[in-house]
Design a protein with these regions (language model features):
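Positively charged, low-complexity intrinsically disordered leader regions
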Residues: 1-30
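Glycine-rich phosphate/diphosphate-binding loop of Rossmann-like nucleotide-binding domains
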Residues: 39-53, 136-225, 229, 234-250
């Protein structure tokens, strides 16, 4: 029976530390503030927004929601970003992605001030994550993966890791961050010839493809640690599930994150951490 790597204890520890740092900033007259920009009403965006608002409240961060219709124009969205850039009381900006069709996400990302980019949306922040140079913030979910592994004492130095997924939001950043911690990382994707074999060879598997049950019983073995980043709705089961077949993996592997209740809880805590750090930098 696998150890469940639950996100709540990790998030709770981070929240306690961040609340103290937030209180110290407020004593100096600095109110850490995050702008949360949502275009449209995608269910996963709404879910993340609820979690982010709760986390900000617990830490003491002021959250300002900017809610835009799905048919907002490119110019209108860019104007919102410019307002955030020039508002010195706003320290961080979270914008839910992907944006609706018709909007140029790359142009919007490039318009945001990197100092306020708390989820690695801008090219400058991504460069920091992938190169290890600079002061940009890593993607919250990617950093949450490492925070969770560290909290539970999972050894990364020299470990073989299979990262399944190569998106710029999770896959590539988490692979770079794990490599920086001296893990030996294999990035798997749709053209990987034998995905199951690559996963079986790994000590740690990070599943981040956004497709339910991508990692099945043929891809796991004993003594592995499984980090399931996926959040998918299983119509047949009527519940949220990850990218890993949890029922097949949990009796076999050494440790696994549940979905829900795993990485997601830590992601909002990392978001709060980035907002606090941005406020600390801006107030120096």
């Amino acid at each position: 029976m696998a150890e469940l790597l639950k996100g709540a204890p990790v998030a709770r520890a981070l929240t306690e530390e961040l609340a103290a740092r937030c209180a110290a900033l407020r004593e100096r007259g600095v109110v850490p503030t995050s702008a949360i920009v949502r275009v449209g009403e995608r269910e996963d965006d709404l879910s993340y927004e609820r979690g982010a608002l709760k986390r900000c409240e617990k830490v003491g961060i002021e959250a300002r929601r900017v809610l835009l219709p799905a048919d907002v124009s490119q110019d209108e969205l860019l104007a919102v970003i410019e307002d955030i850039n020039t508002d010195s009381s706003v320290h961080g900006c979270l914008m839910f992605r992907p944006l609706p069709a018709g909007l140029d996400e790359d142009a919007v990302a490039a318009a945001l001030d990197p100092a306020k980019d708390v989820d690695s949306m801008t090219p400058a922040s991504l460069l920091t994550t992938l190169s290890g140079r600079g002061e940009g913030f890593a993607p919250c979910t990617a950093e949450a993966v490492l925070a969770l592994l560290d909290h539970y004492g999972v050894e990364l130095d020299g470990a073989k890791v299979a990262v399944v997924g190569r998106s710029l939001v999770i896959g590539r950043p988490v692979a770079a961050m794990l490599t920086a911690r001296n893990a030996t990382v294999t990035t798997c994707h749709t053209h990987t010839r034998d995905l199951a074999a690559e996963c079986r060879a790994a000590d740690i598997v990070v599943a981040a493809v956004g497709r339910a049950h991508t990692i099945g019983v043929d891809a796991i073995r004993e003594d592995q640690t499984i980090i399931d980043v996926g959040i998918n709705w299983d119509e047949a089961a009527g519940k949220l599930v990850g990218d890993v077949d949890f029922d097949a993996a949990e009796p076999v592997v050494n440790a696994i994150t549940p979905v829900p209740g795993g990485v997601g809880a830590v992601t909002t805590a990392i978001l709060a951490k980035h907002v606090i750090e941005a406020a600390e930098r801006a107030s120096k």
